[in-house]
Amino acid sequence: MYALVDCNNFFVSCERAFQPELEGRPVVVLSNNDGCVVARSNESKAMGIKMGTPFFKVRYLVEQGRLVVRSSNYTLYGDLSARVMSLLAEAAPRLEVYSIDEAYMDMDGVAPERIPGICSALVTRIRRWTGIPVSIGIADTKTLAKVANHFAKKYKGYRGVCVIDSEEKILKALALTPIKEVWGIGRRGAPKLESVGVKTALDFIKRPCEWVRGMMGIGGVRTWSELQGRRMVEDERDEKRKSICTSRSFDKMVTDIDEMTLRVSDFAGKCAEKLRSDGTASYSVGVFIQTNRFRDDLPQYFPNASVRLDVPANSTQEVVAAALRALRMVFRNGFEYKRAGVTVSDIVEADAIQTTLFDFDQEARDRDDRISKVMDLVNTSGKNLLRLATQRPGHYSDGIRREFCSRLYSTSWSDLLEIK
């Protein structure tokens, strides 16, 4: 069986773990640059605040003292996520980390009657050791585990753990699950199904397989089968990323090539680090730059370009150099740029790289690889302690507005809580 562990309102829960005075109060967490709402407490949901709501629309609630707001603190969230995942890894034979706040525990080999007890103990242990509340859904397939998790989270009577382990439970749960809430269907596919009378997950599985294939394609058939208890979604732990993107919106418009070079070099360097961390390399490096689409009073420009490498690369020097070549292809003066990003794609295993017959740069490439490894080692002690000249120093402001950011309670000596 699968047990899906989902941290409840994760970003908000991280803030509350070190600020207990926020318990019971409406809280939202904002995106980069304090742009819009990306996480909500149950209390703020009850106020009608939607995901993606621009901050300026709810700022008056903050000023009236009716809402607490926090800027995104990804260092804190990442550290608490790692702590939660380490506890799960101790309890599960196999663990697949799905996102920063979700993970599947593959419980095959564990006696079915023991699984609910193990999961109930985990809910208590994680809350006690990290301060993070979690919900766990248990079922034979990943999609049904998602359904079970929804019930565990929504209904307090489950005490954080819901098990769907019989046909009777499956049918009852699916009848209560709107089609738009089904993993693999979502809000894009739901209107199409609702228009032909498929309102719930139970309505969906009652349709013939060929009908589902015609409406939703092979992906829909997988979901249809999973909802009936047949495993179709495989373990994705060993799958490598097909592409990696690092991008950011700027708090101030960028207008000159020198400043944009610093930004793009940073993004490309981060992509290279992720490639090396995954043990992969990339054939293609792309860059996009964008003006502010919401500023009708300014000229608009949304170009992108990519550079194809003869030999796949993951060294910071090569990836940054390719990204800057792409940047020079698209950058134009006279525009005010709000956002930029770097994407590496056509990714292969690093140890499977084959050089070309006339590759005369292999010696330089080997040197770059050695330098990148040294950079990775040194930079474990601090951000950008060792960097390229085109990258920004570690103390340089990243240009992100964080007006309401909390402290780095778990990763910085100077931000540790004091007990008096």
Question: Residues of each region from the PLM?
Answer:
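Short, well-ordered strand-loop elements centered on a beta-strand within folded domains, enriched
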Residues: 36-38, 160-162, 298-303, 352-355
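Short, internal active-site loops enriched in acidic
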Residues: 109-110, 141-145, 290-295, 344-350
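Gly/Gly-Pro- and Ser/Thr-rich, intrinsically disordered tail segments characteristic of DNA damage-repair
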Residues: 1-225, 235, 362-420
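Short Gly/Ser/Thr- and Asp/Glu-enriched loop/turn motifs at secondary-structure junctions
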Residues: 98-102, 139-142, 280-284, 335-339
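DNA-contacting surface of Y-family translesion DNA polymerases
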Residues: 181, 189-336, 352
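Short, hydrophobic beta-strand segments
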Residues: 103-109, 304-310, 354-359
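C-terminal hydrophobic structural anchor segments
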Residues: 324-381, 386-387
